[in-house]
Amino acid sequence: MRIPLVLALALASAFAVLPSLASAGVPCGICNSTVPLCVTLVGAAGDAPAAEFGEFVVIMRDLANNPIAGAMVVIDLSNAPDMHFCADQMDPTMTVDCANNRVSKVTAADGSVHFTLLGGSNGAGNASTLLNGGMIFANGVLLQYPTVAAYDLDGSGGVGANDVSALLGDFGLGQPFGRCDYDCSGKVGANDLSLWLKAYGSGTMTRSCGSSCP
C-alpha cells in the first residue's frame, strides 16, 4: 500500500524533530520517565512524616533517556474533592499551593525527586474519588493519573479507629474508592485492611494536618 505524499512528509517532519525535542529536555512520561501508578498520603509523628508508608520517587528523562534536572514536578489533587494535602508538608523543598490542592518540587541533577505527601480524607461515608483521581505533571506536561490513597481517612486525630471504620464502610459499598486502595490493586479488599493495620501499628501517624488545604 502506498503512503500518500502528504502523510509521508508529515511523518518525516515528525521524526526529524525528535532529536531536538530530546535535547530540549522534553519530559517523556509514557516512555522513559519513572512515574508512580499510585500515591499514598500519610500522617506524621511529631515532626517526622511517615516516609516508610508514603515515600515515592519521580524520575524525569527526555526522549533520548537523558535525566532532566530542574524540572518542576507537580502532584495535583484538584480532581479528588475527598482528598486534601496538609498546608505544612514538613519539607522545605516542597511548594504547597492550597488554593489549587497541589504541591510541587524540583528534580535533582539525576532527574529524580522524592515525595512524602502529608494529607488525608474527609471521613466515613464521604468517599467520592475512584481510581486514577490524581494528576502528575512535569514542566506542564501531564505524565500520569495516579490513584490516590490516604491512611488518615477522617483527617483528624491521627490514624485511628475512625479511619478503620471509614475503610470498612468503603469496602462494604463495593466501589473502587482510591483513598483505600493501599496496595494499588484497583479495588478495596482484605490486603488494604492489612496494610492499614500495619501503618496504624507502626505509631508513625499519630498526627493529622494542623491545617488542611481546602
Residue ranges and their predicted role:
Residues 6-17:
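Bacterial N-terminal signal peptides
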